[in-house]
Amino acid sequence: MPAVRGARPIRNSEVKEFHDSIIEPMPVTLERYASVWKEWMNYSDAKSLAGLDDFRFADYTQGTSQTFDQFILKHSKDREILVLRGDFQYHACLGKYVEFKYVSERNQLEEVLKGPGLHALLISAPFSDFGCMHPDFEEIMRICDVMDIPVCLDLAYWGIAKHCHIDLDFFPAIREVTCSLSKPFFTLENH
């Protein structure tokens, strides 16, 4: 049997009226989205993220890559962008166009610093290369705080992570937090 009307939905005013009568429309505002997102970030006992309420702004982007683009554009005017070796490869691609440096380990981080306020750092949690928190995460955040290095925290794999507990109140250098919905929910095809 051939598809009716080219497989398009059949418009039926009775069905639409019934549907509209049983479903209360709930507009998705940015405030509601941010609220649900913050709750979702802490839905599991296997991980926790405290301190999000202290961030003044919440927004959605076209994925974590757009956040990285914006962070790098914002800070590359007057800061060198730092990335730990083994982190997301996308950063290196952008590093071709800005002052950029890979850092192999925490000790090297201290060696490459040119002074306070001259760098910005992107770091993932769980760390891309390890699948868990970077073993030097807390010390790196301490260095960033002391040296006035703004940090973009990449939580792309947060939705499928375990054993990650971060209290943003302890890490004031973290100025931006981004996460991905495509990893835990496979939303890639919904763009």
Regions found by a protein language model. Name each.
Residues 37-49, 131-190:
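Active-site pre-lysine segment of PLP-dependent enzymes
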Residues 71-92, 101-110:
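Conserved PLP-anchoring active-site segment centered on the Schiff-base-forming lysine
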Residues 5-9, 89-90, 104-162:
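Active-site phosphate-binding strand-loop segment of PLP-dependent enzymes
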Residues 61-67, 84-90, 128-129, 157-159, ...:
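Gly/Ser/Thr-rich loops at beta-strand to alpha-helix junctions
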Residues 55, 77-80, 116-119, 146-150, ...:
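A general structural motif
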